[in-house]
A protein has these predicted regions:
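Extracellular/periplasmic bilobed ligand-binding domains
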Residues: 177, 193-288
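Segments of small-molecule ligand-sensing domains
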Residues: 309-317, 331-382
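Extracellular/periplasmic periplasmic-binding protein-like sensory domains
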Residues: 250-324, 378-379, 384-387
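Beta-alpha junction/loop-to-helix N-cap segments that form part of ligand/metal-binding clefts
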Residues: 26-31, 56-63, 75-144, 213-221, ...
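An alpha-beta-alpha
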Residues: 152-212, 235
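Short, low-complexity disordered leader/linker segments with a strong preference
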Residues: 1-43, 74, 106, 387-388
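Hydrophobic alpha-helical segments within soluble ligand-binding/sensing domains
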Residues: 97, 155-177, 190-192, 218-222, ...
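Extracytoplasmic "Venus flytrap"
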Residues: 36-38, 42-66, 88-94, 117-119, ...
Length: 388
């Protein structure tokens, strides 16, 4: 079936919530401590799904890291060293994420960007801490990712933040009764379910119906959605990924007779490429996201322009922007450390203040940035993401 495009508008919600950053450490080899790595090569690892259901994320992430590296090398590298990207395909599975992590260790990576999915990153956080190598995930939003590990950071916000922002937006819109559809076996989906349900109570939103699938790869949600349609809910919170949301959940919800708002989180990014049937089904759909490509700031527009010129606009998404920021965060840390010593890089990451494509952020005790959130909506017309 031919894919259609939707346009997403940035709504007038930019909300900031304080989160937490990082500490601790282990010994790691010191390849240079004098601040000059001229003539050397710095390997940056990248663990992401190059193949599989979430390959669109991996494509944008890999492209964006390479874009950042190309810019860095053109400007003289990091401490005079040339930067090289080594990408490992985790296929969206924890076992392959572990395999990729071990391969990057053997290659002598200075730091690793990854993984993409929370389930995959969860499989390697303890390894990063044990081996003493900085791991920066651009997109794993599960709260548990950065609570205990000394060497683990992220450039994205976390699920408790997204869940609360969804509840706050629902209250602002007057949606007092909500239904939830989520995947019990997926770290991302179940974590967002938990944070939204908790926040809903805080904001006076009644959860009138909860339905679930065992994982995010389900095909038929019609039974659950029929129950939701009959529940009297004015909104449906469905924290799934774009490949389930676009061709399955949204059209099946409308076919079941659900006419209310449908909300999700950053996993909805990419839905515009996975639509099917009547595009009017995608009206009244909203999701939290990390940035808008229509933000007029110079840093955002420079990224959008450079990415589009190099790779085209079709593969660009928010996770790519987060990965671009993650690469520049690693650069900033290595330059501050004056070395590619792993512990020194970790120390330089802790408490970092960084201004990037996805916002002005500061890391604190759990390695998670304090930053703003955008809420986007779809409108059925040809075009691109535009800011309202």
């Amino acid at each position: 079936m031919k894919l259609k495009r939707l346009t997403a508008l940035l709504l007038s919600v930019m909300l900031v919530l304080s989160l937490a950053a990082c500490g601790g450490g282990k010994d790691a080899k010191d390849d240079s401590a004098d601040g000059d790595l001229s003539g050397k090569e710095i390997i940056i690892g990248n663990i992401t799904p190059v193949t599989g259901a979430q390959a669109a994320y991996g494509l944008a992430i890999t492209n964006s890291i390479q874009l950042a590296i190309d810019e860095i090398n053109a400007a003289g590298g990091i401490l005079g060293a040339t930067v090289k990207l080594s990408t490992k395909d985790d296929q969206g599975t924890p076992a392959e994420a572990v395999s990729g992590f071990n391969s990057l260790l053997s290659e002598g990576a200075a730091a690793i960007i990854g993984a993409t999915l929370s389930s995959c990153t969860s499989a390697i956080t303890s390894l990063a801490d044990d081996e003493g190598i900085v791991l920066v995930t651009p997109s794993s939003t599960a709260d548990s990712i950065t609570t205990t590990d000394d060497y683990v950071f992220r450039s994205c916000f976390k699920d408790s933040f997204q869940g609360e922002m969804v509840a706050a937006y629902a209250k602002d819109q007057g949606w007092t009764k909500a239904a939830v559809l989520y995947a019990t076996g997926d770290t991302y989906s179940s974590g967002l379910h938990d944070s939204f349900v908790k926040a809903a109570e805080k904001y006076g939103i009644e959860i009138v119906c909860e339905q679930s699938s065992s994982d995010t790869g389900a095909v038929d949600f019609s039974s659950q959605l029929a129950t939701i349609a009959a529940s009297g809910a004015g909104m449906l919170f469905a924290p799934y990924y774009y490949d389930a949301v676009g061709p399955k959940i949204i059209p099946q919800a409308r076919e079941a007779g659900f006419k209310g708002a449908i909300m999700g989180c950053d996993g909805f990014d990419g839905t515009q490429d996975y639509t099917t049937g009547d595009l009017s089904a995608y009206e009244n759909v909203y999701f939290t996201n990390h940035y808008s490509p229509e933000d007029s700031s110079e840093i955002v527009q420079s990224y959008v322009k450079n990415y589009t010129e190099k790779y085209g606009s079709e593969s660009m998404n928010a996770l790519g922007a987060l990965a671009y920021d993650a690469m520049y965060m690693v650069k900033q840390a290595i330059e501050k450390a004056g070395s590619i010593d792993h512990e020194a890089i970790r120390d330089a990451m802790s408490g970092m203040h960084y201004v990037g494509v996805t916002g002005d952020m500061t890391l604190d005790e759990t390695g998670t940035p304090e930053k703003s959130v955008a809420i986007l909506t779809f409108t059925p017309s040809d075009g691109k993401l535009v800011q309202k």
